[in-house]
Amino acid sequence: MKFVGAHVSAAGGVDQAVIRAHELEATAFALFTKNQRQWRAAPLAEDVIEKFKQACEQYGYTSAQILPHDSYLINLGHPVTEALEKSREAFIDEMLRCQQLGLSLLNFHPGSHLLQIDEGKCLARIAESINIALDATEGVTAVIENTAGQGSNLGFKFEHLAAIIDGVEDKSRVGVCIDTCHAFAAGYDLRTEADCQHTFGALGDIVGFEYLRGMHLNDAKSEFNSRVDRHHSLGEGNIGKTVFSYIMHDPRFDNIPLILETVNPDIWAEEIAWLKSQAEI
């Protein structure tokens, strides 16, 4: 079973994200559980939590179909202790919000060394940050997203993801989300079926498909191996549609959220319908 959707707005309350996903005829969705550009947010009120859970039940979404994303401000590999602590506290808060909403996944960008510490130290800090968050929460899996490798962001190599997982004590609560645009921009080609076989073969060998908890399905405005993160609508960018059809046919991508973060929300329903049609061919 393929779960396909988009990262929808939670404006007006997290329950509104569920309704928006349903209106797209999505079978999965992503959301922010708070303003992603602020450090702090008011705690989730009981009535808000209840409305969200009721909406999920009404429209048939389980936690396996929902991939919340944390704040972009968080850097779990920050080289400066005070800033690292601030990020860790914010990440625990994000995990707790997911826990309150009955969600089982939290997607996040791993972190950046800011040219102040080496890659190895930064990756170890990220793993330690995850361990601290897992100790402080229950039932939520930390889902590390691969990056395009802009600036000093880590996570652009599958080896980075594997190194972080290696440092996490509870392997049952850590996973990865692969963004097709980020992978392409980081030098993992996806333009042909042979490219897909090679790239996903490497993912299986280096990270392991047992850790795959979600996908972000994005075409790329950015060039191959450019280390630039610029999303595009499916089939309109430099990757093309082959990989998205490939994913919809491959059972290794079953039963996880497959989430659009493409640039034109007006055609999300169309893109979701096209992806579903590929699964049926």
Curated annotation (Swiss-Prot):
Keywords: DNA damage, DNA repair, Endonuclease, Hydrolase, Metal-binding, Nuclease, Zinc
Necessary cofactors: Zn(2+)
Record: residues binding Zn(2+) 2: E145, D179, H216, E261
Reactions accelerated catalytically: Endonucleolytic cleavage to 5'-phosphooligonucleotide end-products
Binding-site list for Zn(2+) 1: H69, H109, E145
Pfam families: AP_endonuc_2
An annotated GO BP: base-excision repair
Enzyme class: hydrolase
Binding site for Zn(2+) 3: H182, D229, H231
UniProt-listed SUPFAM superfamilies: Xylose isomerase-like (SSF51658)
EC number in record: 3.1.21.2
Molecular-function annotations in GO: deoxyribonuclease IV (phage-T4-induced) activity; DNA binding; DNA-(apurinic or apyrimidinic site) endonuclease activity; phosphoric diester hydrolase activity; zinc ion binding
Co-factor binding comment: Binds 3 Zn(2+) ions.
HAMAP family referenced in this protein's UniProt entry, alphabetically: Nfo
PANTHER family: APURINIC-APYRIMIDINIC ENDONUCLEASE, ENDONUCLEASE IV ENDODEOXYRIBONUCLEASE IV
Function: Endonuclease IV plays a role in DNA repair. It cleaves phosphodiester bonds at apurinic or apyrimidinic (AP) sites, generating a 3'-hydroxyl group and a 5'-terminal sugar phosphate.
Similarity comment text for this entry: Belongs to the AP endonuclease 2 family.
Protein name: Probable endonuclease 4
Species per Swiss-Prot/TrEMBL record: Yersinia enterocolitica serotype O:8 / biotype 1B (strain NCTC 13174 / 8081)
